[in-house]
């Protein structure tokens, strides 16, 4: 975990925050991340652990919770949903699938050749000196140029790729693809009537129901915090869909669908769409990055704490 090691004495209430890079947030110093800000806002009366893993979807997070909940025995668990790609991640990961009767099944999956090559390259680069890696990263970032206008062509490419991912998934593929890429759930946001979109919603609901049941078995209260991404909540983001070209797009749809899923499975949910949308670009990283920044995580923590208190979660003494 990115947070400090759990206190073995466990003298305070312990909350664990699960999710992906919206939780791990290695683009910010740890003290500016959502879990760290949440703990600071309790005046350190609550120990808040950060169990987020960059690139994880809700399916992988469920498996991580199976390991960490019995080990660290928290008083509560928070699942942060990244409403950029968390619908699509389980389809690309191919670790879980629904059969024709809607029953969820697990299976083994292996990374595709591009992902394996990426990991091997990063493993090789990790042996270089810090200065050499910094120099390489600087040159890579210099080569990136933010488009002057939203890239609507890329959105069409995303939707085509999402249809292909869906077709491979339902045909039984066991190859995991795009493990660390932020692929916007454009099909759900723009075309909720598509089979790929409808399947993603059903799969997400089955996964969240499994997470709910796991937490109930462990005696751990669960709450979900849904965080929008820059394509939907930052008016200046480069990948923001054009309503003229995509009249079916609703910027609040991804977060609203997650909220509806939580309500149907009976999990308390906080939807941060309105909060972050009103704050605009100042709470997002900007450029080519869809993540919230330190200001966004602070605002999210300040909004989440009263919500969690309203669920009866103890803040200790």
Each language-model region and where it sits:
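Histidine-centered active-site loop/cap adjacent to the catalytic His
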Residues: 288-317
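Membrane/wall-proximal cationic-aromatic binding patches
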Residues: 1-41, 65, 159-190, 256-258, ...
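Second-shell loop/turn segments in exported
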Residues: 21-25, 50-51, 197-201, 247-248, ...
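Short, amphipathic alpha-helical "lid/cap" segments that border enzyme active or binding sites
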Residues: 58, 62, 201, 205, ...
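Generic structural signal for small/hydrophobic residues in well-ordered secondary structure
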Residues: 20, 61, 77, 215, ...
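Serine-esterase "nucleophile elbow" of acetyl-processing enzymes
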Residues: 1-54, 59-73, 77-78, 117-131
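Serine-dependent acyl-ester chemistry module
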Residues: 82-260, 272-282
């Amino acid at each position: 975990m990115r947070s400090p090691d759990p206190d073995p004495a466990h003298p305070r209430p312990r909350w664990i925050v699960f999710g992906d890079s919206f939780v791990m947030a290695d683009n910010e110093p740890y003290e500016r991340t959502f879990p760290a800000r949440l703990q600071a806002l309790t005046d350190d009366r609550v120990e808040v652990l950060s169990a987020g893993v960059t690139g994880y979807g809700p399916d992988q997070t469920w498996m991580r919770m199976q390991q960490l909940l019995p080990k660290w025995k928290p008083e509560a668990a928070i699942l942060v949903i990244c409403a950029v790609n968390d619908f699509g991640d389980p389809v690309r990961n191919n670790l879980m699938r629904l059969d024709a009767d809607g029953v969820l099944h697990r299976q083994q999956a292996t990374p595709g050749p591009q992902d394996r090559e990426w990991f091997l390259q990063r493993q090789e680069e990790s042996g270089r000196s810090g200065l050499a890696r910094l120099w390489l990263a600087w040159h890579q970032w210099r080569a990136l140029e933010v488009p002057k206008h939203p890239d609507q062509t890329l959105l069409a490419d995303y939707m085509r790729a999402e249809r292909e991912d869906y077709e491979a998934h339902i045909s039984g593929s066991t190859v995991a693809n795009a493990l660390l890429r932020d692929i916007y759930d454009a099909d759900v946001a723009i075309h909720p009537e598509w089979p790929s979109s409808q399947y993603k919603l059903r799969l997400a609901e089955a996964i969240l129901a499994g997470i709910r049941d796991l937490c109930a078995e462990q005696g751990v209260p669960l709450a979900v915090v849904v965080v929008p991404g820059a394509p939907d909540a930052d008016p200046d983001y480069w990948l923001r869909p054009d309503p003229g070209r995509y009249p079916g797009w609703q910027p609040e749809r991804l977060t609203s669908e997650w909220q509806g899923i939580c309500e149907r499975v009976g999990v308390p949910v906080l939807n941060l769409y309105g909060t972050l949308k009103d704050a605009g670009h100042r709470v997002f990283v900007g450029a080519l990055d869809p993540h919230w920044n330190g200001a966004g995580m602070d605002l999210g923590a300040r909004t989440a704490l009263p919500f969690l208190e309203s669920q009866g979660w103890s803040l200790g003494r």
